[in-house]
Amino acid sequence: VNIIDVSTVNPDALSLKNLLDGVLDKTVSFFEEYNVPLPSRQFWTMGNVAIDCAQLAVSFTQVYLGLPGDQASQPQRCSVPRSAVLKISLSREIPVVGANGKAPTGDRIQAGSEIAAVDAWVFMLLIKHLDQWEPDEFGLGVIATAEVSDFEGGFVTTTMQVTMSVP
């Protein structure tokens, strides 16, 4: 695959890339601040994320003219803020049916689920840092929801969808 180098692209064209870099960095730093361990695989991407191992992924869904939550309700002038819809997903291994065909105990299932509850709550604490991009800066607000997917392939994925302004 020939990956195109963007180092010479006009800086104005890098706003979305820089946002994705920043959201990933802020997420990692925030989880570290709360002493919540993260998988070593950490990245951002465009579109849906394949879940094939433990990982932290930031994925781009869309960008639009207008404030967070004000998507296409009225025609917008070109000078208004842009908002991006992103998903921050954290996939972790969970107890599954063993090679002997025996299901994990309820205690093991609950113990394996505890980190997903922590992940969902830390995501909701993180939103302040995504709204206030710079320290002591007042943001335009965010829209955020956190949810947990069905167990799939031995993984549980906690995802926060966030709509935020592009700084």
Where do the protein language model's features map onto the residues?
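Polar low-complexity intrinsically disordered regions enriched in Ser/Thr and small residues
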Residues: 50, 69-72, 101-104, 142-144
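Small/polar-rich, solvent-exposed N-terminal microdomains that initiate assembly or binding
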Residues: 1-78
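Ser/Thr- (and often Asn-) enriched beta-sheet segments in non-cytosolic proteins
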Residues: 57-59, 64, 83-85, 145-147, ...
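Oligomerization/assembly interface segments of phage tail-like spikes and tubes
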Residues: 80-97, 153-167
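Extracellular/virion structural assembly segments
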Residues: 2-13, 18, 77-83, 91-125
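Acidic-leaning, charged glycine-interspersed low-complexity segments
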Residues: 28-36, 48, 110-165
